[in-house]
């Protein structure tokens, strides 16, 4: 299968640099494509399922390209990012931040109806909310237990603590 070059995933209109209003992000698509391909080739060579995080680029076009060249799915941090990717037709999503609160759980349930989203959690209350959202969506939600690997930001701190949200 031949994968189109990265530019085919975007609608790009040439602009003279002097016409750009600053500040403006500018990327070299050739370099981006080379880096994404290099990383995917490395993952493939090691037998790793690549699930790139879109928190830096947040572009559906780049995510689609990453999937086209072999990424298993896309990782998102926030519900809005997941919704944007789903609106762009991407359905294999992993959300790496707890979903808490009734409004967000309703949005998560709506998203779960149209995607294969999975999510991480680090405590039983979050898992209970996700189970409720799954029932509302009419499907089981895959939940991974987040473990703190030393950054002391999120996640459970021990194997014993991991068993608690896993129920």
Specify the residue positions occupied by each region the protein language model found.
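Expand to "…catalyze enediolate/carbanion chemistry for C-C bond making/breaking, isomerization
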Residues: 23, 33, 40-42, 104
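Short, surface-exposed alpha-helical recognition segments that flank or form part
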Residues: 27-30, 118
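N-terminal hydrophobic targeting/anchoring segments and the immediately downstream early-domain regions
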Residues: 1-8
């Amino acid at each position: 299968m031949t994968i189109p070059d990265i530019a085919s995933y975007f609608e790009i209109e040439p602009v003279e640099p002097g016409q750009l209003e600053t500040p403006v992000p500018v990327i070299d698509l050739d370099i981006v494509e080379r880096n994404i391909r290099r990383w995917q080739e490395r993952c493939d060579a090691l037998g790793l399922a690549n699930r790139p995080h879109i928190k830096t680029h947040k572009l559906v076009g780049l995510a689609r390209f990453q999937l086209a060249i072999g990424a298993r799915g896309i990782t998102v941090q926030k519900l809005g990012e997941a919704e944007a990717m789903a609106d762009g037709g991407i359905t294999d999503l992993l959300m790496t931040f707890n979903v808490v609160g009734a409004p967000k759980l309703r949005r998560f349930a709506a998203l779960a109806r149209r995607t294969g989203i999975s999510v991480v959690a680090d405590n039983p209350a979050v898992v209970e909310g996700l189970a409720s959202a799954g029932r509302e969506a009419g499907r089981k939600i895959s939940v991974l237990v987040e473990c703190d690997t030393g950054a002391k930001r999120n996640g459970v701190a021990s194997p014993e603590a991991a068993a608690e949200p896993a129920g």
